[in-house]
């Protein structure tokens, strides 16, 4: 968890995809390419578990991040769905047949995240406010 960033919960977005995480073998090159092609605004990178994490915004209610792939991970993207309560939605997802990839945990002040694999193999992150 980082102390540098925080996030205030935005009510009314339950069920909306509000963040997309891009896993890249070369995050800096991906960032440069995205900045050249899309009208995204980037914040200065901060240190994450896989190295520099590059946050971007593309609207007042959406954005994402670019990070280095983990060992053995293929490049790709993970949509993050905004939820009212990450713990409650995580449990509901498991009861509905999802597989747990990461239990709910705080990633920064104000943000709690869990990750599941939905039936059919799709990976989806759930993001809600901290308690």
Where are these regions (language model features)?
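N-terminal beta-strand motif that seeds the catalytic metal site of vicinal oxygen chelate
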Residues: 1-31, 77-79, 127-131
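Active-site beta-strand termini and strand-to-loop segments that position acidic
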Residues: 56-60, 116-119, 129
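Conserved active-site tyrosine of GNAT-family acetyltransferases
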Residues: 30-34, 93, 121
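Vicinal oxygen chelate
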Residues: 17-25, 70-94, 112-117
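Conserved catalytic-core motifs of GNAT/GCN5-like acyltransferases
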Residues: 41-48, 102-107, 131
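Core segments of cupin and vicinal oxygen chelate
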Residues: 11-17, 21-62
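Short acidic/glycine-enriched loop/turn segments that link adjacent beta-strands
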Residues: 48-52, 73-75, 107-112
